[in-house]
Each structure stands twice: as C-alpha cells, then as structure tokens.
C-alpha cells in the first residue's frame, strides 16, 4: 500500500490511527512561526507541534511556565497559515487547564476557534482525566503527554529521566491507559526508559510519540531548532543533529556583513 503519509493529503487524527495500525512511524517537529512551519510542512512531516517550548526557544525563558494563552495563540496562528499537510497540535500552556474544567474548556475552545489548529496537547495523567474528557466531549481532539512533563519542572526538581522506579513506571502505565480510554488520539512519552515506552505503546490504541523514550514508540518528536543544530550547549543523549543550520546561518550573516562593509553589496545588478 505504500506509506500513508506520502500522498500529501491532510493528515488527521484518523490518519494517526491508520499509521499505527499499518506500523508506519509518525514524525513530528515543533514550529512557532510561518516561515519555519512552511518549510517543515513542505518537507513531508506528519505533524507539527506548536510547543510551549516557544517560551524557551523563541522568548529565551528558562522554562515553559511563563508563556501565556495569548502568546500560544499568536504562534499557532502563524503556523496554521503555512501548513497544508501536517496535523497541527498546540500545547495548552501552564495555568490554562489546571484551575478548573470550566476554565480549561473555555481556554481550549478559544484556542481552537482563534488558531485553526487540529488538536490540543495537555500534560498529565489521571489527575486531569475529567478535563480531558470535557474537551473531547466538546469535539476537541486531545494529545496527552506523560513522563517528563516540563510544566512540572519545579515539582520534579529538574529535567531528569522519569519512571525509572517501579512505582512511577506503574503509574505511568495506568495514566497512559486512562488517557487512552478517555479518548486521547496520541500521547507524548518524554524521557522515560525505552522498555517502559514500548510496553505503553503495546497497551494503548493511542499513537505514542517519543522524545528520549526509545525506538519502540509509534513516532518521534523533537524541537526543530535542536534537531537542525540551531541551539548551543544543549545535547541530551536522545538528541541527534540532522543538519547544522546554526553554523550555516552564522556563515551567511558573516558573508552579508563582509559584503556590505566592503561595498560588494548591493551590486549594480541588485540596484534599481
């Protein structure tokens, strides 16, 4: 039958389920702006995540906590204007769904209406199940996120590997099953042992998307700036640089500066 994602039709949550059933890996990268999203989409990615990691990557914050609903909407609008093929998922930021189900639903509906994204992603397990169900009942596709959940960095005391101990591993499996039964179409598994992630993948119908969770997940996600070698001083074990865009950008800027300083740009052909 060939790969399901190569015909350039719009990827949907239904496509995700079909890909899992067919054994086709799902690819996901983050994007936060129109230009980058257009490049990533045209390259054939299955899904684009407007991550609250924009707080770090775009705004330079130390963690994801400061970013607001308004800021996420701004980034999401920029991305959806560029995307024709990929399934677009947007993170609900910290504080937008933890206070009450009613406030979560209000924020979720606003984000869906004002951005045009295909789904929303929430961090957490059984403790947010009622909220997840409320969103799904309202017709909003929900993408779960377990393991290292960056919005809980202060509770965890850092960004270390999660679920290494039996009790936490068992809870993660229970959380994944609960999210699956609630109707989540996909679940990110972040920085958990590969064997555990593979076991979760076997036990749930939802597509599992790994980041630092081994090859046994149904798909993988990375922050695009990390994957393309644009960030400095960040090289966790799970990260591979698939390009060296940062180096090329530096060379390009240096070439531009040199051309302007020496009078080589603009040339007569580049002038009106």
Regions found by a protein language model. Name each.
Residues 2-272:
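Alpha/beta enzyme core
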